[in-house]
Structure formats: structure tokens, C-alpha cells
Regions:
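Catalytic core of the metallo-beta-lactamase
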Residues: 112-168
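Active-site metal-binding motif and surrounding structural segment of the metallo-beta-lactamase
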Residues: 38-87
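Cap/insert and terminal regions of metallo-dependent hydrolase folds
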Residues: 158-241
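Conserved beta-strand hairpin/beta-sheet module of binuclear metal-dependent hydrolase folds
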Residues: 1-47, 138-154, 171
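Divalent metal-coordination and catalytic microenvironments
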Residues: 3, 22, 34, 43, ...
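Active-site neighborhood of phospho(di)ester-bond hydrolases with catalytic His/Asp-centered motifs
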Residues: 32-36, 53-59, 63, 93, ...
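Metal-dependent catalytic neighborhoods of phosphoester/phosphodiester hydrolases
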Residues: 67-75, 102, 217-225
Length: 244
């Protein structure tokens, strides 16, 4: 299993960057996790949109779905140019029918509703869900394949259920929208200390901090998280990758 970061900014992308987007690969299957602003452009530097096998969306805030429309256009135009593309499944929840309806576009993409109470099979991946604490319906994901596990918290404030959900994961991709002295609870986001606490309680092997703030010194997020978690910590950046 290999994860590559495409976008890691919270809220909106910095110049020449992208908000949430992560490419997960295993056995030749390519799953894009969220598709925020700037993701399509940055992804094309190393991977083409028509090569995707599936897209899964945690929630429907713009910094996680902004590039779905242009992804659909890219695959449509490539089909006109003779590049055969199958209909791309876009997995999402059904709690916002207005946004979910946009996932189906001609025969280019098709919205597929996941049941948060069941396990979703997507290629080689088995995906389970946990509803997070966020202003809109949002789901964390536990993605497993061949005995390896990735946790994607998506957007959430800290909740104890996440520790059990994330237990013994090989990689915890954890949102970190705030510094340790701040309080992210009302905004539905975690701090660096929350991320470190979650990683420690869940006994994960690696922690990746993402959904980053646009201010302050990002290295401090790692320093603060390390006061709670003694394992390897990385700060998400464009094309950061991890194979496990």
C-alpha cells in the first residue's frame, strides 16, 4: 500500500498548493481520497486523472470536493481524444442529496452511496467508517488491504471513539488544523496535541499531520504532537509518500 499526498492545506490551498487530496495505491488500483481545490492540477505532475479507479469523499465542504467538477471534465475530454475511460465511481454519503447528486455526470462518473455502518469494498481495499465531530456530516475511514491499515480522520474535533477506530494502524493521516494552545472543538478540528494523543492512544506506527493551518510555524505542530506521541511524525507536504 502506498499513500501520496497531493494536497494538505485546510480551508483553501496556498499559492501553488492544494487542499485535501491523497492518492492511495495497491495492486495497481488507484483510489483518490478527497478532491479539494488544486488537487487535479497538482496530481497531473505525476499521475493522470483518467488513470484513477475510484474516488471517495469524506464530506462535502469545498476544500474536499472543489475539484470534482474539473476532474469530470478532464475524463470527458480525454474520452473525446480517444482515451478510453470506464465510468469512475465516486463514493460518498447520502446525507446531503444536493451535493451527492453532482457525483454522477453523463457516463463519466457515477455517485455511489456508501453505508457508514457497513464495510465498503473498493478494488483491493476494505473501508470502514466512523462519523466525526464536524459542522457537516463527515466520516473518518479505516482502509485495509493485505494486513495493512491506513486511517484517515478527515475533519473532526477529538473524540475518544477515534482511538479504538484507529487502533494499531500502520499510518494515521490525522487532521491538525490548530496549534496546541488553541481550541478546535467548536470548529470541528483537532490541535497538534489532539493528534499526538490520538496516535498514542491508538498505538499507531506512524503519524502524518495534515489539513494544515495557513499561519504560524508548521514545525511546531510536529514538536507539540511529539509531547504526546513518541513514534515517527511527519508533516504532510506535496508528494510526500509512504509505502507500507
Amino acid at each position: 500500500m502506498k499513500l501520496t499526498v497531493i494536497g494538505s492545506w485546510g480551508g483553501y490551498p496556498k499559492a501553488d498548493g492544494a487542499s485535501s487530496g491523497y492518492l492511495l495505491e495497491h495492486e495497481g488500483f488507484h483510489l483518490l481520497i478527497d478532491c479539494g481545490s488544486g488537487v487535479l492540477s497538482k496530481m497531473q505532475n505525476f499521475f493522470q486523472p483518467e488513470e484513477l479507479d475510484a474516488l471517495i469523499i469524506s464530506h462535502y465542504h469545498p476544500d474536499h470536493i472543489a475539484d470534482i467538477g474539473v476532474l469530470q471534465h478532464a475524463r470527458l475530454i480525454q474520452s473525446f481524444l480517444g482515451r478510453k475511460t470506464d465510468t469512475l465511481p465516486i463514493y460518498g454519503h447520502s446525507l446531503d442529496q444536493h451535493e451527492f447528486a453532482k457525483f454522477t455526470y453523463k457516463d463519466i462518473t457515477k455517485g455511489v452511496c456508501y453505508d457508514p455502518d457497513s464495510t465498503l469494498s473498493a478494488g483491493p481495499f476494505q473501508i470502514r467508517f466512523l462519523k466525526t465531530n464536524h459542522p457537516v456530516p463527515c466520516y473518518a475511514m479505516r482502509i485495509e488491504a493485505d494486513g495493512k491499515t491506513l486511517i484517515y480522520t478527515a475533519d473532526t474535533s477529538y473524540k475518544e471513539e477515534l482511538a479504538v477506530f484507529s487502533e494499531n494502524a500502520d499510518l494515521l493521516v490525522c487532521e491538525c488544523n490548530f496549534y496546541g494552545h488553541q481550541n478546535g472543538k467548536n470548529a470541528g478540528h483537532m490541535t497538534s496535541l489532539d493528534a499526538g494523543t490520538l496516535a498514542s492512544k491508538a498505538n499507531v506506527k506512524n503519524l502524518l499531520l495534515t489539513h494544515l493551518p495557513h499561519y504560524g510555524e508548521l514545525r511546531k505542530l510536529k514538536e507539540e504532537a511529539s509531547t504526546k506521541y513518541t513514534g515517527p511524525i511527519s508533516i504532510a507536504d506535496y508528494q510526500w509518500s509512504h509505502t507500507f
